[in-house]
């Protein structure tokens, strides 16, 4: 049976780049992998076909020969470039699944074949509590973070001074071993050296063979103005160190904003509850309110009711990605006086009597409410 065109097998154009070819291979290899399709001969054949196409098109020399001469250019029986056979499934997935699943398939998150596996260090998380004012204006601070550093006794080798790590006898320094089971040959992380390619016969007593010890380091952290609760700041390279020369992880500083005694934040806007005397609500006047930038005042019209909201533009918080500050919403609460003197009581009674003489025009909300109640019972 004639072989299908390699580009057709992978579903890519003839001018496809290396990244596009690799992406297509990943997708198809995962789809037809025998582990996902047990006892499925068609899937097995598709998998072999996809693997062969990728082996040819991912190699610059073979691809050039194939583009010029077709299958004859890469068929060893035709004197061309020659295929290298299929080998085990581990070869097909050593790079692909290693990129997708990290250590789960082949042991290494990064790194090439034939040597100790290289691992990126783990990320660290640090929770930090700040005030609303600090979140609004931003500030620089220092944090103390527990972290791993190279052991000073063994200089990071993990071996007792005077000794040194030795090549792992199980994997012979490769960091991986092949496990054969029937039709499959699977590459796994070496169980003795855990992918390092070496083992330590006499561990350092200070670091117990890890080559690193824990200590607290001080880091500078810049809190940007406008940061919100739950946001994270990334400090690149300040996570745990990598293994076998792998890159370090990152530190993520998670921000939590303390509850404020006056303001509640809603995005870039602020809200506050403002009690005002009933006389100010009735007669109107100027009231003063706090803001994060100081004090501000605004007029309250006469006849203001409790629960009325006033909007002060630009008195909120300037967001991280905005040059315009949010607004401050002031919710006024009309305060009823308490602990009245006899004279004050008499004055209020006279005032109440004068309101009754004026009819419903002094209390429009009360009239509206009583009218609704009356219609409800009718």
UniProtKB/Swiss-Prot annotation:
Q: Where does Zn(2+) 2 bind?
A: 168, 171, 190, 193
Note the zinc finger regions (CR-type) by start and end residue: 138-216
Please share the entry's free-text remark on the cofactor. Answer: Binds 2 Zn(2+) ions per monomer.
Instruction: Tell me the compartments it is located in.
Output: Cytoplasm
Q: Where does the record place the J domain?
A: 5-70
Outline the CXXCXGXG motif repeats, range by range.
151-158, 168-175, 190-197, 204-211
Binding of Zn(2+) 1, residues: 151, 154, 204, 207
Q: Name one GO biological process term.
A: chaperone cofactor-dependent protein refolding
Classification via Gene3D superfamilies: DnaJ domain, Heat shock protein DnaJ, cysteine-rich domain, Urease metallochaperone UreE, N-terminal domain
User: What Pfam family is a match for this entry?
Assistant: DnaJ_C
Swiss-Prot/TrEMBL cofactor(s) = Zn(2+)
The Swiss-Prot or TrEMBL record annotates one GO molecular function as:
ATP binding
Arranged from A to Z, the UniProt key words for this protein are: Chaperone, Cytoplasm, DNA replication, Metal-binding, Repeat, Stress response, Zinc, Zinc-finger
Gene Ontology CC: cytoplasm
What this chain does, per the entry, is described as: Participates actively in the response to hyperosmotic and heat shock by preventing the aggregation of stress-denatured proteins and by disaggregating proteins, also in an autonomous, DnaK-independent fashion. Unfolded proteins bind initially to DnaJ; upon interaction with the DnaJ-bound protein, DnaK hydrolyzes its bound ATP, resulting in the formation of a stable complex. GrpE releases ADP from DnaK; ATP binding to DnaK triggers the release of the substrate protein, thus completing the reaction cycle.
The UniProt comment on domains reads: The J domain is necessary and sufficient to stimulate DnaK ATPase activity. Zinc center 1 plays an important role in the autonomous, DnaK-independent chaperone activity of DnaJ. Zinc center 2 is essential for interaction with DnaK and for DnaJ activity.
Say which family it is in: Belongs to the DnaJ family.
Extract the NCBIfam families matched here: DnaJ_bact, PRK10767.1
Binding partners and assembly: Homodimer.
Q: Which HAMAP family match?
A: DnaJ
This chain belongs to the protein called Chaperone protein DnaJ
């Amino acid at each position: 049976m004639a072989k299908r065109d390699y580009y057709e097998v992978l579903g890519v154009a003839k001018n496809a780049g290396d990244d596009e070819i690799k992406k297509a291979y990943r997708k198809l290899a995962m789809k037809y992998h025998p582990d996902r399709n047990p006892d499925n001969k068609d899937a097995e054949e598709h998998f072999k076909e996809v693997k062969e196409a990728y082996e040819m098109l991912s190699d610059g020399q073979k691809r050039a020969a194939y583009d010029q001469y077709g299958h004859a250019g890469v068929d060893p029986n035709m004197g061309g470039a020659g295929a290298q056979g299929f080998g085990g499934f581990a070869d097909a997935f050593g790079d692909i699944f290693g990129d997708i699943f990290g250590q789960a398939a082949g042991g290494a998150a990064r790194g090439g074949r034939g040597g100790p596996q290289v691992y990126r260090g783990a990320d660290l998380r640090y929770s930090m509590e700040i005030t609303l004012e600090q979140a609004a204006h931003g500030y620089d601070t220092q944090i103390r973070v527990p972290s791993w550093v190279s052991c000073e006794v063994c200089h990071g080798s993990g071996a007792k001074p005077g000794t040194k790590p030795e090549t792992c006898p199980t994997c012979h320094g490769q960091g991986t071993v092949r496990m054969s089971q029937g039709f499959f040959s699977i590459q796994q992380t070496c169980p003795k050296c855990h992918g390092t390619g070496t083992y330590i016969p006499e561990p350092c007593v200070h670091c117990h063979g890890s080559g690193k010890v824990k200590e607290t380091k001080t880091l500078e952290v810049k809190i940007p103005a406008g940061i919100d609760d739950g946001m994270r700041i990334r400090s690149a390279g300040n996570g745990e160190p990598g293994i076998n020369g792998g890159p370090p992880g990152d530190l993520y500083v998670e921000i939590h904003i303390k509850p404020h005694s006056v303001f509640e934040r809603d995005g870039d806007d602020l809200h506050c509850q403002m009690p005002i005397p009933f006389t100010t609500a009735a007669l109107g006047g100027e009231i003063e309110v706090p803001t994060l930038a100081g004090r501000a005042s605004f007029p309250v019209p006469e006849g203001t009711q409790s629960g009325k909201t006033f909007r002060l533009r630009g008195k909120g918080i300037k967001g991280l990605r905005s040059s315009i500050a949010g607004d401050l919403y002031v919710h006024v609460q009309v305060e009823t006086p308490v602990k009245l003197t006899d004279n004050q009581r008499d004055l209020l009674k006279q005032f109440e009597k004068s309101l009754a003489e004026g009819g419903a025009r002094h209390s429009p909300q009360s009239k509206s409410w009583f009218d609704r109640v009356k219609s409800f019972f009718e």
